[in-house]
Amino acid sequence: MAKKIQKKGKLQQALVLFHYILQLFGCKDLEALSRDLKDPAYEGLNDDHESKLYHELCHKLYATGPLSIEQLYFYDQHIVKFTDEINEKRSEPIKWKYFQYLSLLFTEIYLDQYFSNPQALCHNLNRFLHDDFNHRAETWHELPDFTVDDLNKLAYWNATGSGKTLLMHVNIKQYQEYARIHHAKKLNRIIVLTPNEGLSRQHYEELKASNMDVAMFSKQGVGGLFQGKAVEIIDINKLADKDGDKTVAVEAFEGNNLVLVDEGHKGSSGDVWMGYRQKLTEEGFSFEYSATFGQAISAKSNAKDRKAMFDQYGKATLFDYSYRYFYADGYGKDYRIMNMNDWNDDDLLNMYLTAYLLCLYEQTKIYQSDMRIHNRFLVEKPLGIFVGSSVKAVSKENKNQVSDVTQILLFLQDFIRNRTEFSGYIRRLLSSEDGLKTKNGYSVFGNSFLALKGGYLVEDDKQKFAENI
């Protein structure tokens, strides 16, 4: 029978390492493993200083499976120990959500197998790839085999807001612990690689909060007394092929480093940063964290580069808690995309922008109506954001020849000054027929502002709205 030709793959279909760990628990997907773990009651420790999630996971193991309860206990005690260490100076101790705990547990399992016998791990991954993964209808079947050289790179595809930074801190300790147990070669440096100086400063403060020795990278410190004793933070723009006034040659770091990469593909053009990471970890190891691996691959215009990146992250991604899982668990945001047919229609533009303000007002009224929203869920007051493509430059779509930011400021000025006109827009938007239609003939805002239409907005508010927004 002829081999079925697959269409262009998506990264989520190619996460063979992630599924290799899942099958050790007898599960084919994250939902099957986590179904009974999501209750917040399972967060934190029991009276025996063991993770409650560890005990729940023990119930999922089958007697003849590859993982034992003793192994899970060993891994859990590492996680508990390292969590205690980063909690030492915190007023509010960290309690891992199920997806954070599983990220750390998967890391324990992987590092144990990697340090114990990398050749055996490589063999087991390839056997799983050929005997299981490539026979699933929902997976991508064209990944190349693993080599031992592939194994010193791990990636975590975790959504923004899911706690990637705290995982990084524990990952450092996990790697150091297994390197100690297996008498691995001493690391030259521990490096956190960021896309910019702002994120470098943020990592510095967060590592300090986790009670970890940390320093901002300095050219003068290369080869200095404190080399390897602290986590060093450097943004990718300070690395170069040769030394410069503000840059240091990547060769100066040697190759036996532990490198932790935060959103690396956002910091340097092309694949330069990936080459630097490769040089930094030739004899070492790297952990990489991003919410946008899939988008980064799709953005590659060169087919060869896209495939290389696709294969690399397909084989390196240890845990997938990307946005679809994040959203399904009740995090993230609901959104609507409403494109305007004609940017040059002032009446249409005013209607759309007024609708935006009305939406913000509606959310604010609901927020103020019940303080339990804040007290129980720690939700802050709604925030409105305008995102434009230009601050100084003139937007080509804009007939008034002003920047996007100026356009919004002019709208807000008109909104405040012309109360009668914009009160009319508000009344139209709150009526059953606003006059705006989609291409299919449906009302654009017909199903919007249901809370206001249902009574949150009294008649006096319609007049006060223009004054107080």
Language-model segments: residues:
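Charged, amphipathic alpha-helical stretches
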Residues: 1-64
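Conserved pre-motif I regulatory segment
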Residues: 61-157
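Conserved C-terminal RecA-like helicase domain
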Residues: 93, 122-124, 146-147, 162, ...
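Walker A/P-loop NTP-binding motif
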Residues: 106-111, 165-184
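Signature of the SF2 helicase/ATPase Hel1-core->accessory helical subdomain module
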Residues: 129-130, 168-177, 233, 237-374, ...
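Short hydrophobic/aromatic beta-strand immediately N-terminal to the Walker A/P-loop
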Residues: 155-157, 191, 385
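Conserved Walker A/P-loop ATP-binding site and its immediately adjacent core
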Residues: 167, 183-209
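Conserved helicase motor
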Residues: 197, 217-224, 236-241
